[in-house]
């Protein structure tokens, strides 16, 4: 996939989260990692790329197709994508399987039997079939996040967008989730990932977009970025993260 952003601006009140962000990935990029310090704009850019937020200015293109700013058209784009956040966002009163089937039926218009079959397929794929009747509170953090990934994959999304999916997990649970994401990437799923997990990004990403202060400072193949970052901010960021690892 080829992702492009031209002078994208997004504000939250007086705070400018994206300040004319510009970048383009290579068309060969399959997994794009958004990296940078906290507050740099990663999560906001991820939401704009997925159609979850509309920018005040600028344009985003995916494989040459400009994302619309008109709300109804933007909603159609949003429904083509899948999102996973650090807080899981599973419905606490529903079983794991129901968390997957409900959006398939209510949002995507599938019938109950097709939705149940798709849910079971994904739960088996992600090692969760035996837990399908449990509610989120009965699952570990890693299981809940894998369930959230299954729900995001259920409608066969064009893009899977992951926003800090492991930041609330311990190392064992993090490993569970990262294994799943790696398998998805190897299977051809197009992924945009905002993360501080540099070790994982180094091994799974094809392309890195580095942000700080709401601006994109680097957009390069991942191997080039990790071998020799071009800007001081990226060098300082990578050096700070690796100092105690």
Which sequence ranges carry the predicted segments?
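The feature captures the beta-strand-to-loop junction immediately N-terminal to the Walker
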Residues: 35-37
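ABC ATPase NBD coupling module
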Residues: 67-82, 112-113, 225-229
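Catalytic Walker B motif of ABC-type/P-loop ATPase nucleotide-binding domains
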Residues: 160-163
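Helix-to-loop junction immediately C-terminal to a conserved catalytic motif
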Residues: 50
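A short, proline-enriched helix->beta-strand linker immediately N-terminal to the Walker B motif
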Residues: 154-158
